[in-house]
A protein has these predicted regions:
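Bacterial N-terminal signal peptides that target proteins for export
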Residues: 3-15
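Intrinsically disordered, low-complexity Ser/Thr/Pro-rich tracts
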Residues: 9, 22-33
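Acidic, metal/ion-coordinating pockets
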Residues: 31-190
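Bacterial N-terminal signal peptides
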Residues: 14-23
Length: 190
């Protein structure tokens, strides 16, 4: 009987050791498999810089939507899922501008997921701004729609947001659906 008690005392220790060993082996095997990666990228204050080269001066433009397009092509190839966001001031407010039509086309073609408008978009004036937001939301062969998120762009009469304040994006990461909340609160004054 004493031998049986001695055996029963050792049995849980042996089982626990076996379980820990199995967990360590499983963890080592899982470590060989790289974890899925999510990239969240943002741009801001692009000011209508569409091209790599200034069309007037011929000088190289360091930060432009063409550079973003090239960089995002490489980044999307290196991660399992990506979100691309713009924090506003995307449009050119110079003397020669088209109300943001070219910028809307660029944002859609590059594959931006959302834009949070800032001062630059509001300097367009109400009609051009609304046209810019509508152009972002168009689905066409020129690219996917871009969500406009702005919880602090309020209707003057109702004081309710003109655009959605937030969006919950769902991306596939490995075998899991991951949800990412993006809240749109942009700078409304310079």
């Amino acid at each position: 009987m004493a031998r049986m008690r001695h055996f029963l005392k050792r049995c849980p220790a042996v089982l626990l050791s076996a379980a820990l060993l199995a967990a360590a082996v499983g963890t080592a095997a899982a470590a060989d498999t790289p974890a899925p990666t999510l990239g969240i990228y943002t741009t801001g204050d692009m000011g209508g810089r569409l091209y790599r080269e200034d069309p007037v001066t011929g000088e190289a433009v360091e930060y432009s939507y063409q550079n973003v397009a090239s960089a995002m092509e490489a980044e999307r190839a290196s991660v399992d899922a990506a979100l691309l966001l713009d924090s506003g001031d995307a449009v050119d407010n110079g003397l020669v501008q088209d109300g943001g039509a070219a910028e809307a086309l660029a944002l859609r073609a590059i594959g931006y997921d959302a834009l949070v408008p800032a001062v630059g978009e509001f300097r367009l004036g109400p009609e051009a701004r609304d046209d810019f937001f509508a152009a972002l939301g168009e689905a066409s062969e020129d690219g996917a729609p871009v969500r406009v998120l702005s919880g602090n762009y309020l209707d003057e009469d109702t004081q309710s947001p003109e655009e959605d304040a937030y969006e919950v994006f769902t991306v596939e990461l490995g075998r899991r659906a991951v949800r990412i909340g993006v809240l749109g609160l942009g700078a409304m004054e310079a």
